[in-house]
Design a protein with these regions (language model features):
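Periplasm-facing N-terminal accessory domains of Gram-negative outer-membrane beta-barrel systems
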Residues: 1-16, 76
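Gly/Thr-rich phosphate-binding loop signature of adenosyl cofactor/nucleotide-binding cores
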Residues: 619-621
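Outer-membrane beta-barrel proteins, especially TonB-dependent receptors
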Residues: 11-13, 21-46, 65-73, 77-78, ...
Length: 668
């Protein structure tokens, strides 16, 4: 669909897209859960430094940033261990409680993204309270196909240079896919801070998949390796000039400078699908090893070394449809072992085992789809203490296809999340948040009730969506600042709990007044509050500001001799002032509003009726606006003594150039 030569009708096809973030393959228009789909073409046409950055502008999405290339996903105001990221069919486990490293996935290998909002799906268990981000690889080639492509990218602000090489094939049902990617960037700059020391990074990744695709199903083995070496932005300034302090005279160096990290993530996944007489059986086993080292005083000696082993398992059975009914049942979970091999440790060593079982049932009528299910989870955690957490969750939802153009979705879901090791046992400086953190062994599990109501409208000239949600969380865990100095130069934060309520909505409209012209706009809003609290502690910390986006896109050519799907687009991104913040003990501050303008052009290059390349040029923050995002962790670093401004600002103007070239395409 995404490479169609006539993208004018793309909005009419979206409701027919098959999504898999629910219990089985389901058309988007029949999904009771709120799901967004981002295609590979859309990902390639977005200016970003990583895959989370690429989807962060979707309605209801946001990101916590720490430096130049580090992003953590936020869905409807919730993130970290409240979101499950799925990649290669297994949940990504990379110590996601930390701010100083992102999701260890090569964005070049992501073929599409499904964003599941809320705890409406029961397949993922604890930690999926806010939703699920499913990063899907491109599908295997068809029988007899061999394909290869090369892509390259350059960004002007931080000198980011990246390339990726990929080859894949299918011969007699034997499938293979191999990829290598490399990316490097020097420090980014903005109008107030100049070049920001410690924001440079280097990323390398590899992937190999071998498997069999047969009439009985498939069996595939996948190996991935991901290496990220980011320096750490400390934000320290000269007391007289207010300028950021550098450890080197070369502000555009691609080399790592102290302090820096080394993050290495390895993964092996065995994915099996078997078609049975009355259904299908899916079985996936995965092993991951995450290694995170921090180097502070010497490039040869690490002070911090976290090593995390994770074994995941997932078995589920899905019946064939009978009389409009579908039934699914499954068992999944994981085993973990975390080791501290450095001199310093923020969290204690621990071992974890969890298991969960679920069952769902759905029924399709001519205009109605009903879906419901129940799940039980149990988690055992052993560190300095022994903890056991368990919870029962469930959901019930319906979709009413009122007519060909109008769908109405309703869903009520119960969510559950056990406290993570950082919340229970932290005791040290967390470089990603630039603060000293203290855990609390007395924390209880979080439970939530969330209700969703959505309306989708699609016609030849207009596509519109609006989705409302209300989320009530008991025992919501967050870090608040306390008046205690544990280490000089760092504020001290302690994890605590309260009852929370989140209300919000996402709305979007795409108008096509003429064949080539698209006028699009979205708005996202979430109000996150603690219940029965005074003004200073009323709002939950680090809640995304209301955001309005608008875009005018004109498609220049369709089926041209040399250019195909050529377009030019002008976009606006307005973040409103965030006055809803946690005021107690100066945990956070208000964030002023700001507006960014963007410009992009793109096209497919054609030779003899065949696509030979995709070209994209994008300019982000076109007017070079100086701003701080409310979710930037660098907002709370040192004050500039010369100007009185606190913290480090986000990236200034950035022009991005991308090219994707298919090297080989054969069919025998």
């Amino acid at each position: 669909m995404e490479d169609s030569t006539d993208v004018f009708y793309r909005h009419l096809q979206l409701n027919e897209v098959m999504v898999t973030g629910v219990t089985g393959d389901t058309k988007l228009k029949h999904s009771t859960a709120p799901i967004s789909v981002v295609t590979g073409k859309e990902l390639r046409g977005t200016a970003s430094t990583n895959v989370i950055d690429a989807v962060a502008k979707q309605p209801g999405m946001a990101q916590v940033t720490t430096g130049g290339g580090i992003s953590k996903p936020i869905i409807r105001g919730l993130g970290y261990n409240r979101i499950v990221v799925m990649n290669e069919g297994v949940r990504q486990e990379g110590q996601q409680w930390g701010d100083e490293h992102g999701v260890e996935v090569d964005g070049n290998g992501v073929g599409s993204v499904e964003i599941l909002k809320g705890p409406a799906s029961l397949m993922y268990g604890s930690d999926a309270m806010a939703g699920v981000l499913i990063l899907r690889s491109a599908p295997a080639p068809l029988e007899g196909e061999v394909r290869a492509n090369a892509s390259t990218e350059y960004q002007t602000n931080n000198g980011l240079f990246a390339y990726s090489l990929n080859g894949a094939g299918n011969h007699g049902g034997f499938v293979w896919d191999a990829r290598f990617s490399d990316k490097r960037a020097h420090a980014y700059k903005n109008k107030y801070d100049g070049y920001v020391p410690g924001s440079q990074f280097r990323e390398r990744a590899g992937r190999l998949m071998l498997g069999l695709n047969k009439r009985w199903g498939h069996s595939q083995l996948t190996w991935t390796a991901f290496h990220l070496t980011p320096s750490i932005v400390e934000g320290e300034r000269d007391e007289e000039t207010g300028e950021l302090e550098w450890a080197t005279d070369h502000h555009k160096t691609y080399s790592k400078t102290l302090p820096f990290q080394q993050v290495k993530h390895y993964k092996a996944v065995w994915d099996n699908l078997f078609y049975l007489p009355k259904g299908s059986l899916k079985a996936i086993v995965g092993y991951q090893q995450n290694r995170r080292q921090e180097f502070e005083e010497s490039a040869d000696d690490y002070e911090v070394f976290f090593k995390l082993h994770t074994l995941t398992y997932d078995v589920r059975y899905l019946t064939q449809e009978f009389g409009g009914w579908k039934v699914a049942a499954g068992v999944n979970g994981m085993w973990q072992k975390s080791q501290n091999l450095g001199e310093e440790a923020l969290i204690p060593e621990y071992r974890l085992f969890d298991v969960g079982g679920y069952a769902t049932v759905s029924k399709d009528w001519e205009r109605w789809t009903l879906n419901s299910g129940v799940r039980y989870d149990r988690r055992h955690l052993k560190y300095d203490h022994t903890k056991n957490f368990d919870g029962v969750t469930g959901s019930v939802g319906a979709v009413w296809n009122a007519c060909k153009s109008l769908n109405v979705r309703m869903n009520v879901a119960r969510g559950f999340r056990a406290p993570n090791m950082s919340e229970l046992g932290s005791d040290g400086v967390h470089e990603g948040t630039v603060r000293y953190e203290l855990g609390s062994a007395s924390l209880k599990p979080e439970y939530s009730w969330q209700a969703d109501l959505g309306v989708d409208f699609s016609s030849k000239y207009v596509e519109a969506q609006v989705a409302f949600f209300a989320n009530r969380i008991s025992n919501y865990i967050f870090a608040k600042r306390i008046d205690r100095v544990m280490e000089e130069g760092y504020r001290t934060y302690e994890y605590t709990q309260g009852d929370a309520r989140l209300l919000g909505f996402e709305a979007g409209v795409d108008v096509h007044p003429m064949h080539r012209l698209h006028l699009g706009s979205t708005f996202s809003y979430v109000d996150a509050r603690q219940l029965n609290e005074p003004e200073e502690t009323r709002y939950l910390p680090f809640t995304p500001a209301p955001r309005w986006t608008a875009e005018v896109k004109y498609e220049l050519t369709h089926r041209g001799k040399w250019l195909n799907n050529a377009y030019v687009a002008v976009g606006m991104e307005c973040h409103l002032r965030q006055n809803h913040y946690y005021k107690a003990d100066e945990t956070e501050t208000a964030t002023p509003s700001y507006t960014l303008f963007n410009l992009s052009v793109g096209t497919d290059l054609m030779v003899c009726g065949r696509k030979v390349a995709e070209l994209y040029v994008m300019a982000d923050n076109l007017l070079n606006r100086s701003y701080q995002d409310h979710l930037s962790r660098l907002k709370y670093t040192d004050v500039n003594a010369a100007t009185g401004r606190m913290g480090v600002y986000n990236m200034g103007r950035n022009v991005v150039m991308k090219m994707v070239v298919p090297l080989v395409f054969e069919k025998r």
